[in-house]
């Protein structure tokens, strides 16, 4: 169940169902960008939108992306040997233009907000992003994104 737990209305129910259908001794696992702690690759845009007074993109169950919540959900589903860990990745763009072309698009949770913005508002967003992004001397941008992962075994 990769990168979806925050979009599920009832994560506990979904995990319980996965635990039910996986054979005894099988593994139930997921990973999700840590959306509440800024681990999402789109976190810079989300922060800029918030700074500019735009609504933060939200998912149905953002708290489910947290390691402690994942641990609790897996244990509540009766899974054993539950482990959580963090997956860290560098996010790199060759230029600010590449960053914008890849991320200010009318899809996903950020796109739900940016697609409703006027051209002036998009320019304000870009100005804010230029201020906050770590732009290197060569114009490239690199920052870290991180996801939390969890796994547990079905008893038996």
Task: List the predicted regions and their residue ranges.
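A short SAM/SAH-binding and catalytic strip from SAM-dependent methyltransferases
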Residues: 1-12, 34
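Short SAM/SAH-binding signature in class I
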Residues: 1-3, 29, 147
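Short histidine/acidic/glycine/proline-rich micro-motifs that form metal-
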Residues: 5, 34-36, 61, 89-90
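Short conserved AdoMet
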Residues: 9, 23, 154
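A short glycine-rich, Lys/Arg-flanked "PGG" loop and its adjoining helix->strand segment in the class I
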Residues: 12-27
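Conserved class I S-adenosyl-L-methionine
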Residues: 27-54
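Conserved Class I S-adenosyl-L-methionine
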Residues: 59-156
């Amino acid at each position: 169940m990769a990168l979806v737990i925050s979009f599920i209305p009832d994560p506990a129910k979904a995990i319980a169902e996965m635990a039910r259908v996986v054979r005894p001794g099988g593994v139930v696992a997921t990973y999700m960008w840590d959306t509440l702690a800024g681990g999402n690759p789109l976190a810079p845009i989300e922060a800029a939108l918030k700074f500019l007074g735009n609504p933060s993109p939200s998912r149905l169950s953002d708290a489910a992306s947290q390691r402690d919540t994942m641990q609790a959900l897996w244990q509540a589903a009766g899974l054993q040997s539950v482990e959580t860990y963090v997956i860290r990745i560098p996010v790199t763009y060759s230029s600010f233009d590449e960053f914008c072309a890849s991320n200010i698009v009318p899809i996903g949770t950020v796109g739900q907000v940016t697609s409703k913005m006027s051209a002036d508002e998009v320019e304000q967003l870009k100005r804010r992003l230029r201020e906050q992004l770590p732009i290197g001397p060569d114009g490239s941008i690199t920052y870290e994104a991180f996801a939390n992962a969890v796994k547990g075994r079905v008893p038996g």
